[in-house]
Amino acid sequence: MANIKKYAPIIHEGVPDLNPESVAYREFWDEQIERCKNGYKPNGMDAISGKHYYYLNFYKILGNSGEKGGRKSLIAPWYRDMDREYFNLFETCKDEGKGMIVIKARDKGFSYMNSGMLAQEYTFYP
């Protein structure tokens, strides 16, 4: 579990408390924009796409925080290998100008992933 936290540093480490006028502040946000656009590869781990990085770090979904009997609330998405495969396949199809059909069960988070991809696209490519 500790390793997958590397995919979502904003969620697990937070945003550093930097002076908005400082060079360090600008460099931090430039790095986040770069990761959201072009993807991210933590040391010793597989790369994730920019859309997936944005989804894991800056998007919120309605879900259970893990408490028994708790109500759903806005949470950060969890990293799942299945999601990484979906985001990667989406990028491949987009690059090749092809469509995609997915056979899946209900309640697997695909509506959230797709809306996250739209939010990333709208945020960085208006």
List each language-model region with its residue ranges:
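Phosphate/NTP-binding elements of NTP-utilizing enzymes
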Residues: 1-126
